[in-house]
């Protein structure tokens, strides 16, 4: 099984969730073993997608350094993971990725347009060898060894509309596109004023966010899935784990997880060299793992 990049460059435009300004995005092919690289064209600054370059996880996953930052990368990273793309350059002319419709389906469409290209190098994956867990009170995220990677996610909100939701996701591109990619980000009406006073969520609207009041959803079209909230959390988690630099072959289990806990989990994994193994998918080893990339 070979590493993948894009067959051609594709461009798109969307609104930034937090600043509310138009953003141009370009996805470009990269050579083997380059990984996922973000480039701020307005700053002439590159940022490798990796846990060590994460500087904030409050409202989104943010890469950066003293030159600047790039926010809200998780939806795009999630789509890149689902398509099995190992090497890609993401060019942005602003400090965040566009929110599109609040899900990752627009990025999936861009990747469909770009198509994928095999490179002359074996694909590598990260195989989890022993359990790794991060906790914050009763909230936790955990990676454990497995023969068939799954995500088991539970959320619990003190809100009648959301309440407690659980979802089990088994990795495959087809499953992702059908059941995860269209799940939108969500927020609460009561938080909007406070966020905007901090210059956040200025681009948020019913076009790109599920807005929840105390006992109703304000979006006139309603939900895309009855459990869209937990499905979006899975979308986010896939994007956050992609910062490890490889498709992760392990069970991810979360109760009330977050970008912050996901970030701590990726750091915890990398801290313990016995917790994982990087496996090169040569012909002799790929059969056990190829289902994940179907």
Curated annotation (Swiss-Prot):
EC number(s) per UniProt? 3.5.1.108
Q: Which InterPro entries match?
A: Ribosomal_Su5_D2-typ_SF (IPR020568), UDP-acyl_GlcNac_deAcase (IPR004463), UDP-acyl_GlcNac_deAcase_C (IPR011334), UDP-acyl_N-AcGlcN_deAcase_N (IPR015870)
Record pathway: Glycolipid biosynthesis; lipid IV(A) biosynthesis; lipid IV(A) from (3R)-3-hydroxytetradecanoyl-[acyl-carrier-protein] and UDP-N-acetyl-alpha-D-glucosamine: step 2/6
Q: Which residues bind Zn(2+)?
A: 75, 232, 236
Which UniProt keyword terms apply here? Hydrolase, Lipid A biosynthesis, Lipid biosynthesis, Lipid metabolism, Metal-binding, Zinc
> Active-site residues?
259
| Gene3D superfamilies, sorted | lpxc deacetylase, domain 1 (3.30.230.20), lpxc deacetylase, domain 2 (3.30.1700.10)
Molecular-function annotations in GO: metal ion binding; UDP-3-O-acyl-N-acetylglucosamine deacetylase activity
Gene Ontology CC terms, in alphabetical order: membrane
Q: What does this protein do?
A: Catalyzes the hydrolysis of UDP-3-O-myristoyl-N-acetylglucosamine to form UDP-3-O-myristoylglucosamine and acetate, the committed step in lipid A biosynthesis.
Q: Tell me the protein's name.
A: UDP-3-O-acyl-N-acetylglucosamine deacetylase
């Amino acid at each position: 099984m070979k590493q993948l990049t894009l067959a051609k460059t594709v461009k798109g435009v969307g609104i930034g969730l937090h600043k509310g300004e138009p953003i141009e995005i370009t996805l470009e092919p990269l050579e083997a073993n380059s990984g996922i690289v973000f480039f701020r064209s307005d700053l002439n600054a590159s940022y490798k997608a990796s846990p060590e370059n994460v500087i904030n996880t409050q409202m989104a996953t943010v890469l950066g350094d003293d030159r600047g930052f790039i926010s809200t990368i998780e939806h795009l990273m999630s789509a890149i993971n689902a398509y099995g793309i190992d090497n890609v350059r993401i060019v942005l002319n602003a400090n965040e990725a566009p929110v599109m419709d609040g899900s990752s389906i627009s990025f999936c469409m861009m990747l469909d347009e770009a198509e994928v290209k095999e490179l002359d190098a074996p694909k590598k994956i990260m195989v989890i060898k022993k359990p790794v867990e991060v906790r914050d009170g009763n909230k936790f995220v955990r990676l454990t060894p497995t023969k068939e990677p799954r995500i088991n996610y539970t959320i619990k909100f003190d809100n009648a509309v959301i309440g407690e939701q659980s979802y089990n996701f088994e990795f495959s591109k087809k499953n992702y596109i059908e059941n995860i990619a269209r799940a939108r980000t969500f927020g609460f009406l009561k938080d909007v004023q406070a966020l905007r006073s901090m210059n956040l969520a200025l681009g948020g609207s019913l076009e790109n966010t599920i807005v929840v009041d105390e006992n109703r959803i304000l979006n006139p079209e309603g939900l895309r899935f009855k459990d869209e909230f937990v499905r979006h959390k899975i979308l986010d988690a896939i994007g956050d784990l992609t910062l490890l630099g490889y498709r992760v072959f392990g069970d991810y289990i979360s109760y009330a997880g977050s970008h912050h806990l996901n970030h701590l989990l990726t750091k915890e994994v990398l801290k313990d060299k016995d917790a994982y193994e990087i496996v090169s998918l040569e012909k002799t080893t790929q059969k056990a793992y190829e289902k994940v990339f179907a």
